[in-house]
């Protein structure tokens, strides 16, 4: 792909494909717990284990699937990922009376996502100059976020007809798999980093962006996971759904607008803006009414637009590995942060809920938004200043 043209026909097709993949996935994801409970006849603790393993497959395997994509080729990897998505959708469709097929469908879609994400994001920036990367990364994120915003709406319209929903989603996945067969295979560039053995899939890790990404998602996912529960009885379901759609649409509109400015911004400054907005949003939630929740979600959307983009750009700039491997490593960081959010955040939420002081939960999360980033920066600087034992010997 030409280095000087950011939005070629191939890249536009990729962006459209990502939009549709996310519409399909997020028309299913919000309703998975209900679906699994109905088909498996299990309690929510068991359902939580199944969903947790699915999340682990999707995120913890990302460095391995990224290393595989580096060897297999990005176009082939995208086709393979979409075939896995299609098989997962088919398993959901035919597994109404077979819980094992339903669980297999979950794992196939999780595995497909693990392979698709680094391949898609790497293909978008393949052959692009460093000056074009911010626009392409932000456009890729925007397409995904638009799909995330629209997917639950599609799911809500079709959830009463699950067979139809799974048939539509499977048809979308299969059509995309066929379309990606005609995608141009990427050519290896002269300045491409060497392909390293699988055992070195984590070598060349950009440590600071990895750590900041993990912390970002640790605090961010507490908003994403627990606000719906907090909002029950405080605001209407329609208002909450519209507000969360506004969050995703805010990312879609804002991130491409600020991409070049974020790229030029110093990392600590971007962290201050991003985590600062997250803290403001968490504090706003303590108001517990429609205005407070809307303001909080808007602040978090603005902060996320800056912080999440800067994390990826810094990882690309600081690592000597290929973009495919870097995006896989970053996806692992997302999984680490999200898992910590589920464990730590869930216990904290339960503690405050049991004590009848639920707004205090958001103050604790806001305090972490303020305290954790400078702690991460401080530890990173100390590590850089620490003498190397090999040098002193």
Describe each model-derived feature in a short phrase.
Residues 1-8, 184-212:
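Juxtamembrane intracellular "pre-TM" segments in multi-pass secondary transporters
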Residues 5-55, 206-212, 216-243:
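Helix-loop boundary and gating motifs at the non-cytosolic
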Residues 61-73, 159, 253-267, 349:
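Helix-to-loop junctions at the C-terminal end of transmembrane segments
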Residues 76-90, 269-283:
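Structural signature of the two symmetry-related core transmembrane helices
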Residues 106-144:
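Cytoplasmic helix-loop-helix junction between adjacent transmembrane helices
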Residues 159-171, 349-369:
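A membrane-interface helix-boundary motif in multi-pass transporters
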Residues 171-189, 375-379:
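C-terminal membrane-cytosol helix-exit motif in multi-pass small-molecule transporters
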Residues 324-354:
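A late C-terminal transmembrane helix in Major Facilitator Superfamily
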């Amino acid at each position: 792909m030409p280095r000087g043209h950011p939005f070629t026909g191939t890249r536009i097709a990729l962006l459209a494909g990502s939009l549709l993949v996310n519409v399909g996935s997020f028309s299913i994801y919000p309703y998975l717990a209900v679906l699994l409970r109905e088909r498996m006849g299990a309690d929510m603790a068991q359902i939580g284990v199944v969903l947790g393993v699915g999340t682990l497959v999707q995120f913890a395997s990302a460095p391995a699937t990224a290393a595989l994509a580096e060897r297999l080729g990005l176009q082939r990897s995208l086709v393979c990922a979409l075939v896995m998505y299609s098989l997962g959708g088919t398993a959901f469709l035919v597994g109404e009376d077979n819980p094992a097929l339903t669980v297999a469908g979950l794992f196939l879609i999780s595995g497909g996502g693990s392979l698709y994400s680094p391949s898609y994001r790497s293909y978008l920036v393949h052959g692009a100059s460093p000056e074009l990367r911010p626009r392409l990364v932000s456009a890729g994120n925007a397409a995904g976020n638009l799909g995330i915003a629209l997917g639950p709406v599609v799911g809500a319209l079709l959830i009463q007809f699950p067979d139809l929903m799974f048939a539509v989603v499977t048809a979308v996945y299969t059509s995309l798999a066929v379309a990606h067969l005609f995608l141009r295979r990427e050519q290896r560039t002269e300045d491409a980093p060497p392909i390293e053995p699988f055992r070195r899939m984590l070598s060349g890790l950009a440590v600071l962006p990895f750590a900041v990404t993990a912390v970002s998602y640790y605090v961010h996912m507490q908003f994403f996971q627990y606000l719906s529960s907090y909002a029950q009885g405080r605001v209407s379901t329609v208002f909450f759904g519209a507000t969360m759609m506004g969050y995703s649409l805010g990312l879609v509109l804002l991130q491409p607008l600020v991409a070049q400015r974020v790229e030029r911004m110093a990392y600590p400054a971007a962290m201050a803006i991003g985590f600062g907005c997250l803290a403001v949003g968490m504090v706003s939630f303590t108001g517990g009414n429609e205005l407070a929740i809307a303001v909080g979600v808007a602040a978090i959307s603005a902060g996320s637009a800056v912080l999440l983009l800067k994390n990826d750009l810094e990882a690309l700039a600081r690592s000597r590995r290929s973009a495919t491997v870097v995006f896989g490593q970053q996806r692992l960081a997302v999984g680490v942060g999200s898992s910590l959010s589920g464990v730590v955040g869930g216990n904290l939420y339960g503690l405050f809920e049991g004590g009848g002081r639920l707004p205090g939960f958001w103050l604790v999360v806001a305090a972490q938004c303020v305290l954790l980033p400078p702690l991460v920066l401080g530890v990173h600087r100390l590590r850089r200043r620490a003498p190397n034992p090999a040098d002193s010997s």
